[in-house]
């Protein structure tokens, strides 16, 4: 529909001859997948987003969120909330775990719709390009935690803070509620994870629960790069 076409037009068309940008993003793939994400956002999870006015309309920023739900669905929902933001739509990038390219088809698919390997160099380049970048500092510690540990924040990596200070970049804190219930893991089968070369092998109920989701975008936070006073 016309609204979806408007969303697609928000994405920068800075792709090369073969239709891909430097990180593997492909505008055609977005056109093919955005309708499904719209369904997840509006109908399946019935997402309510708050604080959208806090997202800068332009310029670099880091979207720092909690992570849960086994699959990167929460990242897709955050991205759609930003893309459909009535206060000023933005097409963000999202940092993903380094093991995703080892999963057949998944890595290329995620790259094609705006996901980028979670490497500091990639993030630096995107911030230099004035991108809005979604980061989950908990990583797999958050997304693959057991259901009994739901809503318990896991340790945050601090790489995003160093980048925010080094590149004078505002941090937009984000809380996602509801995805803990979407896919429920009851155990991590470590021998299997080691065998297949993945960080985790969750024992899950093979069903995605249509849990109601809420996304809260906080006000921008700025941190001064004061390395001279570090001890």
Regions found by a protein language model. Name each.
Residues 1-82, 86-114, 118-121:
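Membrane-anchoring hydrophobic helices of lipid-metabolizing enzymes
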Residues 1-29, 125-231:
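Non-catalytic C-terminal accessory region of glycerolipid acyltransferases
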């Amino acid at each position: 529909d016309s609204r979806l076409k408007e969303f697609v037009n928000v994405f920068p068309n800075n792709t090369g001859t073969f239709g891909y940008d430097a990180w593997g993003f492909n505008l055609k793939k977005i056109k093919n997948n955005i309708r499904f994400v719209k369904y997840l956002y509006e109908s399946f999870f019935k997402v309510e987003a708050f604080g959208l006015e806090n997202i800068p309309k332009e310029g670099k920023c880091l979207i720092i969120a909690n992570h849960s739900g086994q699959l990167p669905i929460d990242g897709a929902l955050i991205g759609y909330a930003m893309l459909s933001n009535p206060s000023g739509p933005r097409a963000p990038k999202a940092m993903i775990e380094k093991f995703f390219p080892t999963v057949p088809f998944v890595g290329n698919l995620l790259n094609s719709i705006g996901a980028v390997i979670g490497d500091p160099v990639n993030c630096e380049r995107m911030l230099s390009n004035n991108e809005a970048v979604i980061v989950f500092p908990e990583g797999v510690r958050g997304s693959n935690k057991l259901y009994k540990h739901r809503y318990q924040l896991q340790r945050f990596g601090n790489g995003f803070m160093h980048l925010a200070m080094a590149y004078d970049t505002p941090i937009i804190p984000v809380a996602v509620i509801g995805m803990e219930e979407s896919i429920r893991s009851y155990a991590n089968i470590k021998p299997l994870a080691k065998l297949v070369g993945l960080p985790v092998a969750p024992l899950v109920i093979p069903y995605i629960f249509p849990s109601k989701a809420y996304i809260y975008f906080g006000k921008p936070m700025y941190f001064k790069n004061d390395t001279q006073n570090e001890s």
